[in-house]
């Protein structure tokens, strides 16, 4: 049985176009095989939906055209036949082909409405016209097979601008559909037309690129003549800024590593990154400034703005006014913060800093100490001597102000700047923020010190020890304010407007000229002040009398309590023994006198 399998099996031959495959030989390559031209790969159409597109070189036969015209002539009698023939001739070369011919749903609806006598039809009348006049829809009038094409008709009525809806006059009736006379004639634009017409889109895109390249080679800065449509990506090769206010020096190229966005309408020239190709290096050798990271600058500007609104004290040379309510000098807010400038620019033109007293602001490598006390306005103030120890960025030395013994400790950063060596603008900005915060804290503390300190009487006021400067006092406003309080507040006026020569010479002072130019008699002022002092003294005497009376009443109460306690003690010690016996006898009934249980 096994010998039967050892026999030679017949060789099978496969013929391809009448040629046996075993006769080709083993060494013949695949490329040498004779292949029929019909087996070559065919180009796939854009859409495989029905109906299939016809070949490009296809020519319609004459009988088909005649039959199409004959079928279209049945659509509408009279004048509509010529319109249908013109539409067929216009759409003969169109790629949109339907089962009923070259006409679309919109064209059929247009002919249906145009064939009516009053040029208007309802939706049901349009359905009826389709079934009666179009052969394709004659057998599709039932509800099962008409759902698709009726839905298409409703969509075309709603989406096309050539149709307009008119409300029916009767109640409960459907609306009329009419042709819009304001609609543009010709082929209606579909929503996907821009994305489907790829050939026109590519041609337009290529023309835009060529135009940009020509302008770039010619060195033209303005692109006013280049106005392509919004759908074309004009900016894909555009890396110039023609009319930007930030780049008035002319058009310049962007960084070569800048990657434009993909072909989209959002990639316009106004949305490219405005970064130069070269780095921004300052002349003094510091690294380039990142303009996108401006949080520190914005924080400094907000800090200085808030300080200008909240603080009324600043470090200027002269004071502009005097407040009688608080006794502190008030000045206008400091100017806005300016970033530090290099030493070369400061040597060319130096301007006084809002935070310095005796000269221009030095560079940000060193900070000079102040030469005058900010609050006491004295060159020989002891605050300056105590504050010479220096200020480090990590530690702040607190001292007591000698002028106010009952005050809280305050920081030395209000009185002096330390000689701190900085490395760059970042350290300067950080130190400025720290000093401004310390300045606000110290000013608040010293304001409380002045308010809590006891006011000096007018008779103990010494003009020689008071550092008289260019202080101005509006005496009229001060008196009006004090009179409004009813004369119950103490007044402490530094005679700042008095001429220092008259004070030193000892000449009598009769009049004071205020800042408004009016003259005020000193005698009247002293009389008013004396009257206020008398009223205050009377008020103090009344308070002292009340306190004395209260003290006397308390003493009387204490004496009465002592007398009552001593009399009770005497009565207790002088009671006879009979009373004691009586009290004992009175308390005896409460004692249990019954015999014990074991007694019989």
UniProtKB/Swiss-Prot annotation:
Gene Ontology biological-process entries: cell differentiation; glucose homeostasis; negative regulation of cell growth; negative regulation of cell population proliferation; negative regulation of insulin receptor signaling pathway; regulation of DNA-templated transcription; regulation of lipid metabolic process
Domain of life (superkingdom): Eukaryota
Main location: cytoplasm
Residue spans of biased composition, Low complexity class: 343-354
Protein name: Forkhead box protein O
Keyword Transcription attributed: yes
Cellular component, GO annotation: cytoplasm; nucleus
Subunit structure: Interacts with melt.
Residue stretches of biased makeup (Polar residues): 226-235, 261-270
